[in-house]
Amino acid sequence: GKTLGVVGESGCGKSTLGRVILHLLDSTDGQILFEGEDVTHVDKAKLRALREKMQIIFQDPYSSLNPRMSVSEIIMEPLQLKGGMSHAEMYEKTKKLMDTVGLAARLENAYPHELDGGRRQRIGIARALALNPRFIVCDEPVSALDVSIQAQVLNLMLDLQEERNLTYLFITHDLSVVKY
């Protein structure tokens, strides 16, 4: 698990780069290599398999979460889309993911508007981890958080990287976050 930092001014294309790598936006030229394979122009089936290995943590935890879904529903959604697990298995995995990112079990039926920014970002992190990815684009994951919460979330991300051997593309405009 390594981290590559992408630092630049607002509007310079950092987030666009992350989205192109994940195929959330189409590339216009060049190649994107993932695990030694060109994934620039893959069919839908291959793209679906890639998405399990490549995830994103968005900058704004509030706008990236569906306000009509509970915490457990948000975290469980990728598992439902993938299929192959019973509801009980998905629920168990969701509870484990909540524990992994430091979300109390009592929050499973809470909605995003009921939580602070740090907890919302932990939901986004748990959702990104649900399919056991190898690579995560971290698109300014702490820029919308209070400074005290930023350190907690960054420490969590470092711990997860070590435990799960994750590779991060860490996008930020703040050099102190990259140094952290």
Regions found by a protein language model. Give the residues of each.
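Helix-to-loop junction immediately C-terminal to a conserved catalytic motif
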Residues: 22
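Conserved ABC transporter NBD signature motif
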Residues: 30-38
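Conserved ABC ATPase "signature" region
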Residues: 38, 88-106
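ABC ATPase NBD coupling module
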Residues: 39-55, 81, 87
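Conserved ABC ATPase signature
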Residues: 111-115, 119
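Hydrophobic anchor residue at the start of the ABC signature
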Residues: 125, 153
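A short, proline-enriched helix->beta-strand linker immediately N-terminal to the Walker B motif
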Residues: 130-134
